[in-house]
């Protein structure tokens, strides 16, 4: 079965507009970029690229101990103390007795004076 392209009927008025951006013939199309290099002696060899890679990766390995949740430290209330995640309140347990003190909380003042 041969597929014929479907013809689309376009209703309304339309007109073709000439391309308003003229084609500019660049005279510099055939430029040799090797001649334009400033030093003329760029070292793109695999050896130099490997040296750059090795220089970057010669640093000390990252310390991933901070990512371990058992090593998380708080900077204010529990300074230099490890957080014990085994004592976290379970949902619905002692919610009424648990109040967190807010260091920045300022109680409202009576304005009846």
From Swiss-Prot:
Domain of life where this protein originates: Eukaryota
Entry keyword Cytoplasm: yes
Region (Disordered): 1-71, 83-113
Subcellular location: Cytoplasm; Nucleus
Alphabetically ordered keywords of this record: Chaperone, Cytoplasm, Nucleus
Compositionally biased spans, kind Acidic residues: 20-33, 41-65, 92-105
Gene Ontology MF terms: H2A-H2B histone complex chaperone activity
BP term (GO), one: chromatin remodeling
Bias-annotated ranges (Basic and acidic residues): 1-18
GO cellular component: chromatin; cytosol; nucleus
Subcellular location, principal: cytoplasm
Family label: Belongs to the CHZ1 family.
The protein's role, per its UniProt record: Forms a chaperone-bound H2A.Z-H2B complex that acts as a source for SWR1 complex-dependent H2A to H2A.Z histone replacement in chromatin.
Record text on subunit structure and interactions: Forms a heterotrimer with H2A.Z-H2B, stabilizing the association of the histone dimer.
Record-given protein name: Histone H2A.Z-specific chaperone chz1
């Amino acid at each position: 079965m041969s597929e014929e392209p479907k013809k689309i009927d376009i209703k309304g008025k339309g007109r073709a507009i000439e391309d308003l951006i003229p084609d500019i013939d660049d005279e510099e199309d055939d430029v040799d970029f090797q001649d334009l290099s400033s030093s003329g002696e760029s070292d793109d060899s695999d050896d130099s690229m490997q040296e750059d890679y090795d220089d970057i990766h010669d640093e000390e390995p990252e310390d991933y101990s901070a990512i371990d949740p058992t090593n998380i430290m708080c900077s204010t209330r529990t300074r230099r103390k490890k957080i014990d995640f085994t004592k976290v309140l379970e949902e619905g347990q002692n919610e009424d007795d648990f109040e967190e003190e807010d260091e920045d909380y300022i109680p409202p003042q009576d304005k009846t004076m």
